[in-house]
Amino acid sequence: MKETAEERKTLKISVRNLVEFILRSGDIDDRVGGADSMQAMQAGARIHRKLQKRAGSDYHAEVPLKFVVSYDEYDLVIEGRADGIIYDEDELLTIEEQASDGVSSEQAVFSATIDEIKGMYQDVMAYDEPILVHLAQAKCYAFIFAEKYSLKSIDVQMTYVNLDTEEIKQFTESFTFEALEEWFQNLISMYKKWSDFEIEHKKIRQESIAKLEFPFEYREGQKQLVSDVYRSIIREKILFAQAPTGSGKTISTIFPAVKAVGEGYGDRIFYLTAKNVTRVVARDTFKILEEKGYEGKTVLITAKDKICPHDERKCNPDDCPYAKGHFDRVNDAVYDFLQTGNVFDRDIVYEYAIQREVCPFEFCLDVSSWCDNIICDYNYVFDPNVCLKRFFAEGIRGDYLFLVDEAHNLVERARNMYSVTIVKEDVLFVKKILKNYGKNLERTLERMNKTLLGWKKECMGNRIMLDDIDVFIYEAMNAASEIEKFLEKKIRMEFQEEILDFYFTLRDFLSLSEGMGEGYRIYCDFMENGEFAFHLYCVDPSERLQERLNRGRATVFFSATLLPVNYYKKLLCKEEPYAIYAKSIFDPAKRRIFVGNSVTTKYTRRSAKEYERFAKYIDNIVSAKIGNYMVFFPSYKFMEEVLFYMNMNKDREIIVQESRMTEDERDLFLSKFEEERSNTLIAFCVMGGVFSEGIDLTNEKLIGAIIVGTGLPQVSNEREILKDYFDSNGENGFLFSYLYPGMNKVEQAAGRVIRTTEDVGIVALLDERFLFSDYRNTFPREWEDFMVCNEENIKDAALDFWSEQSSKKI
């Protein structure tokens, strides 16, 4: 609901977040994993319900509690749910009746116990006392409950339970109300500077948004796009926006989202993207708004490996000085940092974190808690194992707006997030390493291996499909539990990273198997290297993604290539969304689309003659005008075959994309397009690779994109399983598993040409299949005027186009 200015300001914080934030201390140490994993949370929820159910009639489970602290400017609401409160209901009714009759509660006899349950995989019997933040959480509930019913004292019971063995260890302590009140008031006094900061910052932010205007002159169709995005947000809908290159989609989504926040239709914006270059564009866009007076705070979250100060990441106090004592220093560092500016990118965050001797990555995450705009990779919202739990804890829906850039990438990314592979050889490897560290550990891994061996013997052909994997899940659960016990010992040894990787793979498998639905297929096969693998494969990620989208208020999926939109609507969400097609601002006369009808990359036609014909197409196209061209191939192998037949002469330079190029090598490759030159540059690249999307070569830096083939993925077990799945669900499986993903790569590659209204260029689609109706149906509307050519007449057609452009300049 939209906020009104007249309402008294309210800040809410959960009891758990309050104590974990204010009372945290000590080191970062990732040598023991799993405490916050999805699987651990699910197992914890189950054990909670089990203990609560058998606790007796005086045990009241999941009791909501709330306490309001009133300050001059605002109310701070502290709320949560106690796992259990033990009391006699008749005694409570007596107190309530006496209160209504005006009888002092001091005359009532009433005792209560707050029960806080913590499920964990660690050995609970090894605890000598409760963990500080766990006890603090229970004490908060005890204070709130005691204050509500005027109790002079109350008991707190900490219940620790092992999630595997269900062993229980309890600690019980009595507190007077006076002691709890003093402790609680001290706790919230430590939080007050943070709540004051948030209230004051939001006031300044909202005032700045009210005055904020669109920072540019609207391009043709751009105002409509801005309006459509704004309307979808205030209606709390999902929007799919096909926004052609040059339509200004970044500012056209960010600006209306910011204005919606100013109107009270949201409170935090997540700008999500798969590529670093688009994150930088988003950052620069928020900087432009800042220059126009916007006072929102923006942080760009960088992957842990890319912001770690060490060559090898080891997040523990023995190996990293920034991990040691991190939590003792980080709160003050965050508070001071927030006063230094409004837009925080990787370099700014890193330098300040190093200066304050805290982990740059964890520091960045803490900064994000106080920012209005978060620019990050998809996985920080959609991946259940690495999502930002401070925002997306189980069951919490926030006032969040999701702007999903380059949304065409999310289908495959989501499939990867919600899928897992367990390799038989990895099981044996870990078993061999850990064989001397406990018989139970060795036995659990041997049982997993034995099950995989049975499937391996059955897998005589390409793959084996599975239905019932309950036994394997049980075996994996036991193995993960035993490995966790080993990790608790913090034994330094060789292959520690491999053990951790395997452990997290098991945890991923267990958490994903918990929510398996119709969108999954389970199979085993032999990988290219001959190893045998078990796959839990998410063929349709829409249900999983929708669960994540439900954590926010509204979502905008946008890209220059979201065609056919129904394909993306079906795979990215379950709700019925809106869809729009933003108008292209480019003059179609400045761009020519050619379709080559005499070649194909079909396997049945691959031959020296066909490779030579492709080379002739390329030679004829680039000889029509000196300039920079990119040629995109379906694979490195195909690229090498065509390269052999290329006409090499002094009037042209050919550069070739290598596999696994470093960042410096990529920069050097692209720098070739910036050079002043009198000859032609031809860059041979791979479709779907790093140079086929997300790069901006404007003006005459790129005048032609030549697409070799339809980009169809290679036939594989995954693709065939996808095809069978969609066929069985009433769709055309070939289109969903092969054609649409392939054509998306084609359109992305073609989009490298014509980046501004001043640009002129050609796109050549070299494959006869582009003339087939299924392929043409995926063409953007701007391609409707394509010209059909062969290798003989395409040079004349290209010459005519460039001649037309020259005549316009005269």
Descriptions of predicted regions:
Residues 634-658:
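Conserved helicase motor "Helicase C" RecA-like lobe of SF1/SF2 P-loop NTPases
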Residues 597-609, 658-771:
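Conserved RecA-like P-loop NTPase helicase motor core
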Residues 253, 356-373, 377-480, 560-575, ...:
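Signature of the SF2 helicase/ATPase Hel1-core->accessory helical subdomain module
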Residues 1-95, 99-110:
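Metal-dependent nuclease catalytic cores that hydrolyze phosphodiester bonds in DNA/RNA
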Residues 67-181:
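Mg2+/Mn2+-dependent nuclease catalytic core
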Residues 349-369, 374, 385-392, 485-601, ...:
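A contiguous, basic/glycine-rich beta-loop/short-helix subdomain that forms a polymer-engagement track
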